[in-house]
Amino acid sequence: MMNAVDKYSTDIIADNEMIIAVDDVVKKDYDSAVVRIKKALARLKSTGHVEKYAEYLNILGLVYEIENDESKAFECYLESLATAEIIRSRDLKAMVYSNISSSYSKMGRDKEAQRYFNDARDEYDSSSEKSEECHKSWVMFDYINHAINDRYVALS
């Protein structure tokens, strides 16, 4: 069993992996980003930091989406959503619903996109978790979503 210092150190290393992964996304080095996020996920799993694990899994889904691997993206989103349900994190559910909505929209499946957008809005509106940590997560998701949108515009 990990002591508090080891757990804290492992969480910090996972956070640093994620920061570098986001930088890799900006540089369009998606393979490196996937590797780094998977390393961060393995570290978080070992510490039992479930909520952050689910947040990072959601981000991995975004990176897969950038790479046009919708199947892997949805696997990540659905596992993240299931975890959010278990830990009762409305803010995390809102983020995942938003990403699923965006995916469906890009596929031209507007009815599903609208449903998940409404779910995201409802979850976020009723969330009591509007903390600084949640805000930082939203900023990171927004940043990567812009990268996805920029890529789709460039491909059009």
Language-model segments: which ranges?
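Residue register of alpha-helical TPR repeats
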Residues: 15, 55, 95, 134-140
